[in-house]
Every structure is written in structure tokens, then in C-alpha cells.
Amino acid sequence: MLDYMDYVQQCFDSAGRWKRQNSYGEVTQTPRNLIDFKIPDAVNLQVSNRSTKYSYNSLQLSTRQSINGSLTYLYTNLDAVEGLVKNTEELPLHDIVQTYELPAVTHHRKEKTNFHKCSLFYGKIFYPSSDVEAMMIKRFSPMNQVIVKCLSSLKENVNIFTAYFQRNSEKNFQELIVSSNDLLCGYRISHHFLRTPSKLNSSLYNNSSLFFGAEFWLGMISLNPGCSTSLKYCTHSANTGRPLTLTLSWNPLFGHISTTYSAMTSSSSTFCAKYDFNIYSIESNLSFGIELWRKTGALFKSEDSVEANRKEYEQNFYISHDHNLLPSKYGYDHEYNISDGKLSKEHKRNKIIKDLNHAFSTSLQKIDKEKTRIENFGNIIRNSHFTSVFKASTSLRERNLKFLWEGEYKNFLLSAGTELRVLKAEESELRRTSGQSSNSLLNEFSLQPLKFGVQIQFSS
């Protein structure tokens, strides 16, 4: 579950029409949300509120080892953020839980929006350690922004400064990163394929998308290089409209290859599988993750609006391409004189055009049905009132089990989870040496708790 300040920053990106999901760092975000989700390791209480129209603050207390906490302050001059940020009583659970990222259906209609330069300032101080975090986001244009992050720790004598120069165009997302830690320099780029509009109609959308990205790093002091490349393919099922995502990542220096498969089996369940392999050590790992949502009903029904949009889409398509605007002189209902050579040729030509239009319209109707199914499935998720979600994941090599429950109770957001490790029990070895045998798995294995925690959030 996102922290309150991360949620406000997400609203800042949405209000400024900045698509963070196009960056290279978000390529494998869905598998991380479903398999590598974070488990609270202590009792954590977070109280947040919006003090003014442009400022937000948050107080956090934790019992990790000892009682500690943090105080966070955020300021932004973007007016549209105020209308997006909601308190815990009104906030939909699906907007703050890190879950499956629905692939956006690509429309090719360019919307004209008025851009205003905006900024975001963030500061966080920890106590009793007095460590300080700071961040600044500055949007210079619809495609360019700069992010500056700082970390200072007096106890560890660490001061790190990192700057991100980002450019987000229609097909490319580029990042230039400079850090004071080892004078680290990096460059990230992700390119989006399958986003060119149709030659017949610019309003058509693509049911699938393909992302390819790479990153390159170099420490200027130690001269240690680093690089990786990733591929992501997102699409929807033509029969059900359910989305699925495939990713492939490769680190050539360390020989690590990772593949993932994520799919929504229904509007309230998700499955993810991840396979890791190292070509140098020949080690492998297989991980699984599931997600089950509980909902009480729909906020409102949208089938009528979806059907109206479908009819409007179909009508606009046929009007824009003049499929039935044949010359009235040679209409299909006219009597043709076979003896007239010219008229007979015109009749044959119009018949060929009619057959082509019929075949073409059949394909369009098929595309239109797929579009309706995809929109209906997305509307079911957006219009449903989810009250809780249960996550579970396991890894064969690490032999662990992770469970997480997140939900809402009255005006609070709750998160509770635990991580268990499967170990071979010592009693099983003693039974073997004494001649005793048992086929029970409970006698062969034991569960060791690694962490357990509860997080409570409240915002007004």
C-alpha cells in the first residue's frame, strides 16, 4: 500500500499528465507488486492531512526495534492536485494499493491541453536519528522535468545527492541520472512500439503495446559498469477483455535472465509467475503470486454509456470514411442495362466496391466487439467498490511464504502481513536415525516466522 505522500505525488503526476509508467523503472512494476510486495515489519501508525490548498503533512510512528518516527511535509503549486487527493474515508482502495497495472488502451486522438509550469517540494525528517530526506520536482514543459533527491545522515556520515533529467515523448522515455555516490552516471531509455495510428482511421486504438528499454551505468570513481535491458508486452484477451502482461529482463554482465507472466483471471483475482535463471552459475528460481479482491458492489452501472460510446465510435468511423457514399447515378437499386458497355463496367466496379466494403465492415465489427469487451472489463474494475485484498507469494529457492491483507475499516486503511520460511525440522532427522518413518509433511518441515507487522493509515 502506498504511503500518503507517495499517493499525493501520484496525484501530482496524474494532474500534470505525466505518465510515470512509461519509464524504464516501471517495466517490471506489476511483478514486483504481485510477488515482491513489502511486508510491514513493525506496528506502524501514520496520520496525514491537507493543511492548506497546496501543502500536505504526515506524522508516522513505528515500533521497529525502538519507538521512532518521522515528520513529512509536501508542497505543490499545481491547483489540480487538490481535486484528486482524497482522504481515507473517500479514497478507493484500488487507487492506493500497489496491484496489477492495467495496460492503457492506446487512442490516437491528440488532446490539446494548456500547460502550466509546476513544482513539488518534499521533505522528511526521521527521529531520533535526525536523518533528512528531500526531493524537488520541476516541470518545465509537457515533456521535460527534473527531479532532485537528497539524503543526509549525521550518524552514518552520508550525504547523497541525485538528479534525474527526464524527457517523456509520445514513444520514448529518456532519463539521465547523476549521483554523488561514486559519481554514478546513468542513462535509461524505453521505446514504445505498436503505437502508430491506423492508416484508415486515426481514431483507432491498439489492443496491445510493446515496450523495449535499456539502462547503462558507470561509476566514475571506481569505473564499475552496469547495464540491463527489458522487454514488456501488454495485451487484452479478445474474448473476455482481460489484460495480461509478459516481461523479459536480461543483465549481460551478471548473466541474469528473468521472465514474468501476469494476468487478471477475473475482475477480482490476479495471477503472476516469475522465473529467474543465471547463465553463469546455472541457478534458477521459480516464484508465484496471487491476488484476491473482495468487493461489495458497483459504484454505478456504466453499460449504457459504454454501448453509447460504441455506437458513436462506429457511426463516426463510417461517416469519416464515406463507406456508403457511392455516386447516386450508379446506385445499387438502379436498373442496369447489360447492353450498355459503359454502364455494365460501372455496375461491375460498384459491385466489387460493395463486396470490399462488406468484407472491410465485417473486420471493423469484430474490432468494435473486442473494443467493447475491453472497455466493459475496465469499467467493471473502475466502478467496483473494493473493500479488501489478500496477497500471497512463494519462492521455491528461498522457500518462503508471504501473506498480506490490506483493506479499509471505517475511516482507516489497514495492512497486516507476515513472512514465513519453510525449514526442514530437526525432528525428522532424529526419526530417520531411530528407524521411525512418517509420511506427514508436518513432520518433515517446519515454518519459521521472519517478520510480522501491522500498518494503520488515516488522512483527513
Curated annotation (Swiss-Prot):
InterPro entries assigned: Mdm10 (IPR027539)
Residue spans crossing the bilayer: none
Family: Belongs to the MDM10 family.
Gene behind the chain: MDM10
Any GO BP annotation: mitochondrial outer membrane translocase complex assembly
Complexes and interactors: Component of the ER-mitochondria encounter structure (ERMES) or MDM complex, composed of MMM1, MDM10, MDM12 and MDM34. Associates with the mitochondrial outer membrane sorting assembly machinery SAM(core) complex.
Purpose of the protein: Component of the ERMES/MDM complex, which serves as a molecular tether to connect the endoplasmic reticulum and mitochondria. Components of this complex are involved in the control of mitochondrial shape and protein biogenesis and may function in phospholipid exchange. MDM10 is involved in the late assembly steps of the general translocase of the mitochondrial outer membrane (TOM complex). Functions in the TOM40-specific route of the assembly of outer membrane beta-barrel proteins, including the association of TOM40 with the receptor TOM22 and small TOM proteins.
Principal place of residence: mitochondrion
Leader sequence residues: none
Pfam families (alphabetical): MDM10
Domain remark in the UniProt entry: Lacks alpha-helical transmembrane segments, suggesting that it resides in the membrane via beta-sheet conformations similar to those predicted for other outer membrane proteins and porin.
Highest rank taxon of the organism: Eukaryota
Keyword line: Membrane, Mitochondrion, Mitochondrion outer membrane, Transmembrane, Transmembrane beta strand
High-level lineage: Eukaryota, Fungi, Dikarya, Ascomycota, Saccharomycotina
Bilayer disposition of the protein: Multi-pass membrane protein
GO cellular component: ERMES complex; SAM complex
Native source species: Candida glabrata (strain ATCC 2001 / BCRC 20586 / JCM 3761 / NBRC 0622 / NRRL Y-65 / CBS 138) (Yeast)
Protein name: Mitochondrial distribution and morphology protein 10
Protein location: Mitochondrion outer membrane
UniProt KW Secreted keyword: no
